[in-house]
Amino acid sequence: METVVGLTAIAVALLIGLGALGTAIGFGLLGGKFLEGAARQPEMVPMLQVKMFIVAGLLDAVTMIGVGIALFFTFANPFVGQIAG
């Protein structure tokens, strides 16, 4: 049982860590492309900004879903019940 709990802790750490890393890379690329587009066509900034914030919200949503799944595995681990039962 300790092995399952330990491996679950490692999986949770990877889930949160890699999710945060992916979001950080995504935000970096998104911000860079937004600034590039704004410098190229300044009249398009309001439309680009709206689209940037929509995509930023979707990037955050993916990370928050990962955090929710990680919290589920941390506090209501379904794998421990399968071994004990």
From Swiss-Prot:
Compartments where found: Cell inner membrane
Protein name: ATP synthase subunit c
GO BP, sorted A to Z: proton motive force-driven ATP synthesis
Subunit-level organization: F-type ATPases have 2 components, F(1) - the catalytic core - and F(0) - the membrane proton channel. F(1) has five subunits: alpha(3), beta(3), gamma(1), delta(1), epsilon(1). F(0) has three main subunits: a(1), b(2) and c(10-14). The alpha and beta chains form an alternating ring which encloses part of the gamma chain. F(1) is attached to F(0) by a central stalk formed by the gamma and epsilon chains, while a peripheral stalk is formed by the delta and b chains.
UniProt keyword list: ATP synthesis, Cell inner membrane, Cell membrane, CF(0), Hydrogen ion transport, Ion transport, Lipid-binding, Membrane, Transmembrane, Transmembrane helix, Transport
Keyword Glycoprotein: no
CDD domains: ATP-synt_Fo_c_ATPE
Family: Belongs to the ATPase C chain family.
Membrane topology: Multi-pass membrane protein
Recorded superkingdom: Bacteria
